[in-house]
Every structure is written in C-alpha cells, then in structure tokens.
A protein has these predicted regions:
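Aromatic-rich carbohydrate-recognition surfaces in CAZymes
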Residues: 1-62, 86, 208, 235-253
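Short, polar/charged, Gly/Pro-enriched helix-capping and turn/loop motifs at alpha-helix termini
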Residues: 41, 65, 103, 218-221, ...
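Well-ordered alpha-helical scaffold segments within catalytic/enzyme domains
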Residues: 26-43, 88-105, 141-153, 189-200, ...
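Amphipathic alpha-helical segments of tetratricopeptide repeats
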Residues: 36, 98, 165, 212-213
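Extended ligand-binding clefts on enzyme/binding-domain cores
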Residues: 21, 46-72, 76-95, 100-186
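Short linear capping/connector segments at secondary-structure termini
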Residues: 7-14, 69-77, 175-176, 225-230
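CBM-like carbohydrate-recognition segments
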Residues: 5-7, 153-160, 177-187, 193-197, ...
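Acidic-glycine-rich active-site phosphate/pyrophosphate-binding loop
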Residues: 2-6, 64-68, 165-169, 217-222
Length: 264
C-alpha cells in the first residue's frame, strides 16, 4: 500500500482495510534471508524503498511502552498488542538494520526503539492481550520470543522447559493450541528452529522427524493431525507449512548459507 503497509488479505470477497504491523515489517526477514543465500546486493537495492516504507509504517504503531499496536483499520490503530506479532517485529527490525548497514543506507530504526520493544516483551506481560482473551494457550506465544531472539539463552531454556509438556506430544509434534488434540506441522517446524537456536540439536532432530510423519505420498506436509481421531485436518497442504519445514531442515542439516539464520 502507499503508506508501506500490507493488508491482512488480498483475496477476500469483502473490502478489507486491516493492516497488521507484523505483516508489513516481515519483508525485512525475507530479504535478509534471501541475501544470505544468494549475496545479491542488487536485489536488496531494488527492494530497499519498499522495505524502508514498510518499516516506517510499522514504527508508527509503536506505543510509549515499547509494544506495537497489532493493526490499523480504516485509519485507526486497534488498541491491543500480540506477543507473537511483536516478537516477529523485533526480528524484522534487526534484519532491517542489517540490510541498511549492508547497503550503507540511512537507518530509521534506533536501538532505543528495539530495546524498548525487547524490554516490553520481557518485562511487561500486561501490555499484551489487553482487550481480548489471552493468547497464551497458543504455542506460538510460547516459543516465538525464543525463536525471534528476544530472550537470552538462560531465559529461553527456562521458558522452553516451563511449558514443554503443555504443547509437545511425545512422538507426534507440537500442538497449535494447548487444550486441543491437534499437532501442526508449521508450529512443530518453528519449534525446531527455536531448539536449533539453542543448540539443542538432538531434541530438534527428533521433533523434525516427528513432523515429517505428516508427509503424504506426494511428499507434501498436511497442516496438522488430530491424534484423538487419528485424522489429518484440515484437508490441506499449504506452501507456508512446507516452507517452515524446509527452514527447520536447513537449520539442522546446514545445506545452504542461511542455515544459521535464526542464530544471530
């Protein structure tokens, strides 16, 4: 969009004006990942104006407490913040700064803004889920601060161990929602990335192998498996699930220059 934002969807039958802050900034992560793989500086240069504008939009949603409003709709900020979304933004801002440094471009993100976000994620739980039901039942809220580098290793291990048994089903994978008998490939693969970041390689390999049990005869991953009913559900095999699995496999097997992407 002209203000640097990305709409939450582009294929809806209804008119959509919802612009999520973490969606807009996440282009930084994709661009830096691409650069680590291909060292294509021209590609970065071409996308710099788009990236810079996207980050400008996201930064406009940061509150005085350090967190980011989760979205803007019809020109107004929606008054709540997501732990997973803000963790994603944290990683995006770091990638943006790396790109700016590589291209010798002016950097609109101050370290103070990043530190403020990090401090909020670590010490101000009251800033998240202020006006809706807590998202803590979702596994992404558990492992994303680890995956995105918000927590140091000691705190990451503490966080990991505290809720491991709530979300991880032995021999199957990671649940998407704590109380549901449903393991999902994308969440399992992302948790592999978090484990790899902490150098918990054996645990990561075991979880990745369990994730691959969701592969069908065509070599594609089902979204998830309802172990209570012994059924794959939903009946879909989305590209983003496969992308998460490829990233997870790369973090363990080191088959591309970006294999340590989540270890910075």
């Amino acid at each position: 969009e002209s203000d640097g934002s990305w709409l939450s969807s582009y294929y809806s039958a209804e008119e959509n004006s919802l612009k999520e802050t973490n969606f807009s900034s996440y282009i930084a992560v994709g661009l830096w990942h691409h650069y680590l793989n291909f060292s294509d500086k021209d590609f970065l240069e071409d996308f710099w104006p788009t990236l810079d504008k996207a980050i400008e939009f996201t930064l406009s949603g940061q509150t005085e407490h350090g967190d980011f409003f989760w979205a803007k709709d019809s020109g107004d900020w929606l008054d709540d913040s997501l732990k997973t979304g803000c963790s994603s933004i944290y990683m995006s801002l770091i990638c943006y700064k790396k790109i700016a440094k590589e291209l010798k471009q002016s950097d609109r993100v101050s370290q103070k803004q990043i530190n403020s976000l990090k401090d909020c994620l670590q010490k101000k739980p009251q800033r998240f889920d202020r006006n809706w039901e807590s998202k803590s039942r979702y596994s992404m809220d558990w492992y994303y601060p680890i995956l995105a580098g918000v927590l140091n290793k000691k705190d990451s291990l503490k966080c990991l161990n505290e809720r491991w048994d709530e979300f991880v089903v032995e021999g199957l994978g990671c649940k998407c929602v704590k109380e549901e008998p449903w393991v999902t490939a994308a969440e399992s693969a992302e948790l592999v990335l978090a484990l790899s970041r902490l150098n918990l390689d054996e645990k990561a390999k075991e979880l990745l192998q369990n994730t691959f049990n969701l592969i069908d005869e065509d070599g594609l991953l089902w979204t998830g498996y309802v172990f209570k009913d012994k059924k794959f559900w939903p009946v879909e095999k989305p590209s983003w699930t496969m992308a998460a699995a490829i990233l997870a496999g790369n973090s363990i097997n080191r088959f591309s220059p970006s294999s340590n992407f989540f270890n910075f």
